[in-house]
Each structure stands twice: as C-alpha cells, then as structure tokens.
C-alpha cells in the first residue's frame, strides 16, 4: 500500500522496470478537499437555463456537450494491435502471453488459438514489441519456416537425392535375436549385452 502525494505513472513505470513484472492499480482512494467542493458548487451555479428557438428550456451544459467531454477526458494514445501468428498453438500460448504481458505499456493481451491471432491493447511501441517477439520466439519461428519449406512440391531432380526414410527390418531370425542381445545401454539402461 502506498500513501501520500506522488506521480502515479512514474511509480508504476519504476515498479515495472525494477521487478520486471506487470504492475496494476487495484484501488485508489481520493480525498475530496474543500476546494474541490467549492469549485463544484460554483460550476453548478453557472449552469443557467435559457430558451432556445423552439421555446424549450436548455441548460448551458447541454448546448456544448462535445466540448466539455473533450476537456474532461485526458487524451491517451491507447492502441489496439492484432497479430496473426501462423505457428500459434496451445503449447506456445503461455509463452507468447508472458512475453507480451511483460512488455512495457501493454494493458491487455488476448491469445486466440483457434483463429491463430493475438489482440494487444495499450500504449506501447509497436517496433519494440515486434523486435521482442522475434527475439524471444526466434527458434519457434525458424522451426515453422522449415516445416513450411518441406511442404512445397518436390521436382524430379530432388526426388532422387532425398532419402525417403524407408528402412528394412532384419529379415532373418538370427539377425533379430542378435539385435535383441546387442541392445545399446542408451535405449534400455537395464539391459545387458553378451558378446
């Protein structure tokens, strides 16, 4: 719990930087000072009613609601970024969520495995986020690219050079029995070999 006068944004930024984890504001108690009450009462007295051309009574606030809303709301540069990731699956969901949620300025991160996309909202630098994702997920991205290359059609020249992965099992009983006795210790640590 933190009390006193301080800059909330700087405090959150320092907490995120020092701990490397996501920090959030759970509750915020604001003290109402006497000056604020006096200002609110003065604003209420300023709302004067007057008649418009049709004869209806209109408050002064109702005349320009758009201007007052813009003044009351501070501008934030919250953006929404949607990333499509081809290799997204359940086993990478947690890893990607961790990388993105630890990034500075990210407010929410939703990982949709079915549609293979990630939706990120917050105030962050897109280029830095891309670099961070590439850096952390490089091995997995390269792995998926290799798998995609294998799916491409093979020309006739390449067919002769490729090992088709066909291996014949020992056909005679002697070879099978010899293979049973000469088992490597890496495959079965409890086995013994008799030579």
Swiss-Prot record:
InterPro entries for this protein: HIPP4/7/8/17/18/19 (IPR044577), HMA_dom (IPR006121), HMA_dom_sf (IPR036163)
KW Secreted (keyword) present: no
Cystine connections: none
CDD domains: HMA (cd00371)
Region spans: Disordered: 36-76, 145-172
Biological processes per GO annotation: embryo development ending in seed dormancy
Propeptide: 193-195
PROSITE patterns cross-referenced by the UniProt entry: HMA_2
Keyword list, A-Z: Lipoprotein, Metal-binding, Methylation, Prenylation
Top-level taxonomic group: Eukaryota
Ranges of compositional bias, category Basic and acidic residues: 47-76, 145-157
Record-annotated HMA domain positions: 78-149
Cited function: Probable heavy-metal-binding protein. Required for female gametophyte development and function.
PANTHER family for the chain: HEAVY METAL-ASSOCIATED ISOPRENYLATED PLANT PROTEIN 18, HEAVY METAL-ASSOCIATED ISOPRENYLATED PLANT PROTEIN 7
Protein name from the UniProt record: Heavy metal-associated isoprenylated plant protein 18
Species this chain originates from: Arabidopsis thaliana
């Amino acid at each position: 719990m933190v009390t006193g006068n301080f800059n909330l944004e700087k405090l959150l930024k320092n907490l995120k930087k020092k701990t490397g984890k996501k920090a959030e504001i759970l509750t915020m108690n604001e003290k109402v000072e006497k000056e604020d009450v006096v200002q609110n009462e003065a604003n209420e007295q300023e709302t004067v009613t007057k008649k418009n051309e049709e004869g209806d009574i209109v408050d002064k606030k109702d005349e320009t609601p758009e201007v007052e809303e813009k003044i009351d709301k501070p501008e934030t540069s919250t953006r929404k970024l949607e990333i499509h990731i081809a290799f997204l699956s359940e086993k990478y969901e947690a890893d990607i969520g961790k990388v993105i949620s630890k990034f500075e300025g990210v407010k929410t991160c939703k990982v949709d495995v079915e549609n293979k996309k990630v939706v990120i909202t917050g105030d962050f630098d897109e280029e830095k986020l891309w670099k961070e994702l590439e850096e952390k997920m490089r091995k997995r991205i390269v792995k998926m690219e290799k798998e995609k290359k294998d799916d491409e059609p093979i020309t006739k020249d390449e067919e002769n050079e490729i090992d088709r992965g066909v291996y014949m099992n020992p056909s005679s009983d002697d070879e099978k029995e010899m293979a049973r006795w000469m088992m490597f210790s890496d495959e079965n640590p409890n086995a013994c070999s008799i030579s």
